[in-house]
Swiss-Prot record:
The keyword Ion transport appears for this protein: yes
Species for this entry: Gallus gallus
Name this polypeptide is given: Neuronal acetylcholine receptor subunit beta-3
GO cellular component terms, A-Z: acetylcholine-gated channel complex; neuron projection; plasma membrane; postsynaptic membrane; synapse
Keyword Cell membrane: yes
Subcellular location: Synaptic cell membrane; Cell membrane
Entry's Gene Ontology BP terms: acetylcholine receptor signaling pathway; membrane depolarization; monoatomic ion transmembrane transport; neuromuscular synaptic transmission; response to nicotine; synaptic transmission, cholinergic
Regulation: Activated by a myriad of ligands such as acetylcholine, cytisine, nicotine, choline and epibatidine.
Parts of the chain on the Extracellular side: 21-229
Function summary: Component of neuronal acetylcholine receptors (nAChRs) that function as pentameric, ligand-gated cation channels with high calcium permeability among other activities. nAChRs are excitatory neurotrasnmitter receptors formed by a collection of nAChR subunits known to mediate synaptic transmission in the nervous system and the neuromuscular junction. Each nAchR subunit confers differential attributes to channel properties, including activation, deactivation and desensitization kinetics, pH sensitivity, cation permeability, and binding to allosteric modulators.
Length: 455
């Protein structure tokens, strides 16, 4: 047991000694490297030498795409690597140390910034430690959160695709001092955290140069092709709008004497106004492009407004009669009582304006009454009976004319009601065709574009 304890004690002392030697070697190495090191001076042997910075981008999260303010917020890692000959050493002289971690604030940095920032934070990165290798290679991969400007193309919202770019380059050094070398044209997405509203279809970088007089300034531009996942807006915006448009069609299926026709149309118009305000909160205030969903809402609002006007007209027709000084014209009788009902598959309408049977009965009644010649030949007793019959006949004719007048008025009212039904049926089919056609024409290009992007 005593021997075991002695072995453990000797082993722990050797580890402590080894650890102490590593710490001492690293401390000595840091003092050696940074003795007289000036981080404000480019680490080159000759003043005309160019530092080549290997640059790459790794995206970890697409935080937000703000359509209203036209911003894209991302969390990325900036991969940077360059040669600093002042920070090289012989590993054998420092206990085999081949790499050390050094605070980036103590090193010369290539001051690479995002040009298209939108919040004033050009650097946007955390000053993490850098890895310095024995051969002078410096590797620095700081995390950064950027808000970059992105011009939104919302024509096909919510089936849209956006192309946002991020442009990186040195803020103060031209191409003769610091040159950017694109390591990989593809953005690293291995650790990308999926966004619930957007997916990245493509993310590639491209090197470019900006000329300014005699100087050239290299930069790297990364383009992100984003596609919106439209399920949310389809369920809570497009489908309700489609439902409201077809609900407008059903207004003409209600009976013409129902006062709820106008109430339904007005309620639909108010609902569409609310949806239009929701769209206005999402899209930017620009007159260059109007989203198709906005055009569709305007189309439906005009559609509903016309339905209200037509409904008022139909209700007016429904309550017309000869008593309101609206006699029915002959062409209205032929068109709305005879021809159109057959075309619209409605039950035939009885011609209520034929009075031949009544006139024949009245003529027959008059012919059966004794004339003046018969009166002269009649006896005095018969004259009394005939006079009584004539008075009775006059009363019957008066009652008959009154009854026919009332029946005529009722028939005219029924005819105007039938005309209102025919108008309702016409506008029902007309608005249904216009609603379906308009919906298809407006949404088909957006659906085609979105489906092509998925293939």
């Amino acid at each position: 047991m005593l021997c075991l304890m002695l072995c453990v004690l000797c082993w722990s002392r050797s580890d402590v000694a080894a650890l102490g030697s590593v710490v001492e070697n690293e401390d000595a190495l840091l003092r050696h490297l940074f003795q007289g090191y000036q981080k404000w001076v480019r680490p080159v042997e000759n003043s005309n030498d160019t530092i080549k910075v290997l640059f790459g981008l790794k995206i970890s999260q697409l935080v937000d795409v703000d359509e209203k303010n036209q911003l894209m917020t991302t969390n990325v890692w900036l991969k940077q690597e360059w040669m600093d000959h002042k920070l090289s050493w012989n590993p054998e002289e420092y206990g085999g140390i081949t790499a050390i971690r050094v605070p980036s604030e103590s090193l010369w940095l290539p001051d690479i910034v995002l040009f298209e920032n939108a919040d004033g934070r050009f650097e946007g990165s955390l000053m993490t430690k850098a890895i310095v290798k024995y051969n002078g290679v410096v590797q620095w991969m700081p995390p950064a959160s950027y808000k970059s400007s992105c011009t939104m193309e919302l024509t096909f919202f919510p089936f849209d695709r956006q192309n946002c770019s991020m442009k990186f380059g040195s803020w103060t050094y031209d191409g003769s001092m610091v040159d950017l070398i694109l390591v990989d044209e593809n953005v690293d997405t291995k650790d990308f955290f999926d966004n619930g509203e957007w997916e990245i279809l493509n993310a590639k970088g491209m090197k470019g140069n900006r000329k300014d007089g005699l100087y050239s300034y290299p930069f790297v531009t990364y383009s992100f092709v984003l596609r919106r996942l439209p399920l949310f807006y389809t369920l809570f915006l497009i489908i309700p709008c489609l439902g409201l448009s077809f609900l407008t069609v059903l207004v003409f299926y209600l009976p013409s004497d129902e006062g709820e026709k106008l109430s339904l149309s007005t309620s639909v118009l108010v609902s569409l106004t609310v949806f239009l305000l929701v769209i206005e909160e999402i899209i930017p205030s620009s007159s260059k492009v109007i989203p198709l969903i906005g055009e569709y809402l305007l189309f439906i609002m005009i559609f509903v407004t016309l339905s209200i006007i037509v409904t008022v007209f139909v209700i007016n027709v429904h309550h017309r009669s000869s008593a309101t000084y609206h006699p029915m014209a002959p062409w209205v009788k032929r068109l709305f009582l005879q021809k159109l009902p057959r075309l619209l598959c409605m039950k035939g309408h009885v011609d209520r304006y034929s009075f031949s049977d009544t006139e024949e009965k009245e003529t027959t009644l008059k012919s059966k009454l004794p004339g003046k010649q018969k009166h002269k030949q009649a006896k005095d007793g018969e004259k009394v009976v005939i006079a009584f019959l004539e008075k009775a006949a006059d009363s019957i004719r008066y009652i008959s004319r009154h009854v026919k007048k009332d029946a005529f008025i009722r028939q005219v009212v029924q005819d105007w009601k039938f005309v209102a039904q025919v108008l309702d049926r016409i506008f029902l089919w007309l608005f249904l065709v216009v609603s379906v056609t308009g919906s298809v024409l407006i949404f088909t290009p957006a659906l085609q574009m979105w489906l092509n992007s998925t293939l």
